[in-house]
Amino acid sequence: MSAFAGADTRGELSTEECRRVVDEIAAVNPNVFLILTGGEPLLRKDLFAIADYAAERRFTVVLGTNGVLLREREAKLMRAHGMLGASISLDSTLSTRHDAFRHQAGAWDGAVRATRVLADEGLDFSLHMSVTDWNVTEIPAMIDLARELGAKVLNFFFLVRTGRGRDLTDIDAAAYERILTYLARAQGEGSGPPSFVQRLLAGARGEDPNRRSSRDPSGVGAVFEDPWSTPVGRADGLLIRAKCAPHFRRILYQLNPDSPLLKNYAHGSCPAGKYYCRITPEADVTPCPYMPVAAGNLRTSSFAELWRDAAVFADLRDPKLGGRCGACEFSKICGGCRCRAYATYGDYLAEDPACAYQPGAHGGDLIELPASLTFGAPVAYELRWDDDARARLQAIPSFARGMVVKAVEAYARGRGERVVTRALLADVRAQWGGRFRPRP
């Protein structure tokens, strides 16, 4: 993300230090999902050597990039060195607006070109859009563009005002509710994009939200012509996710408690400090790219020491939340964005200021998701898995493995199968659209 862009490379981890860190991570968890990002990771001459080293240790390795330097040569190197895909930053459907936001002429063209060379090389990619007040009206168009480009995932990153993001203007809490509801309904939870979202976006464009037309007396279609008003999402193989907005899961639950989109983490919806952390180029370990609270430094402590013993991680794994988040019945599903709380109040356990929900409105009793919808759940076999199937399972990132086992076994039981085999896993992969891609 642009909030952490910079050209100063002094003090960065060397190639050998990166390899040591990979080994230290593998000692804690040998099946890590590793994102090599920046800044711009393609500026590092040793990027593919690091990726290769991690892939050899069975890490799932992907690239996070703005796409400008990603051409056919780089895509081929990605595949050759064990990378399974990339995430591309794209903040507008209009090249001039994206380039202005990224402070780089040609950035939009580079990002779009990168999606094409990745597709040509058979590598999956996701798109990341940083949502602020200036581009929020483009969300429906970005969904359409992501489908057109062939993205597997479209992540909307909602603003946390850190780094360069301090100078940006966030949308207010009421707008969060409306936009997140739109994203839920765009994926089939409900009857389509709600009129209040369409009216919100119309007002943000300076249009009359109450305008009527002869074709649409309600005024909804007058603002949103196709494809704006057409629900899109998983049916076309595109998964839409809201990032840095954990209250999205609360909204999903309110719309449909059985929503398949309610995949969660065992310790709450945000993985920061629980199943996820950032390692900076200078070796600091933080819970998330947007929280500048270091657990320690890998030049003075091992990864295992920091991961197991750091106070900030302990706080986030057993949080004593304050304000509305602490009193909320959705604290297990949501829990608020800890980085936004820190950026606003200087306290990562404070309430999330971007949430408009008042605790108790859904009854007040603590709501928890079943284990079948939980990332980080322990692996519990109820059917027999042959050796080949178990070997394939080891390539699934460990945080998702327990949930994958439950889903695969449910699929097997539905077909009357008593043993999970490699062939059955191939059938499941076809059903899931290849989102999990274990290496052969």
Residue ranges and their predicted role:
Residues M1-G85, A174:
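Conserved alpha-helical substructure of the radical SAM core
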Residues G6-D8, H81, S89-D91, T96-P271, ...:
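Radical SAM enzyme [4Fe-4S]-AdoMet core and its adjacent flexible, acidic
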Residues T15, R19, R44, R71-E72, ...:
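Structural motif corresponding to alpha-helix initiation and N-cap regions
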Residues V21, I50, A54, A114, ...:
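Aromatic/hydrophobic pocket-lining residues that form π-stacking "cages" and hydrophobic walls in ligand
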Residues F33, G85, A151-V153, G336:
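Residues at the N-termini of beta-strands
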Residues L36, A54, L63, I88, ...:
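Conserved, mostly hydrophobic/aromatic
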Residues D284-V285, Y290-P378:
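Flexible mid-to-C-terminal extensions adjoining Fe-S/redox cofactors in radical SAM and related proteins
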Residues G376-P440:
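Non-catalytic accessory segments flanking P-loop/AAA+ NTPase cores
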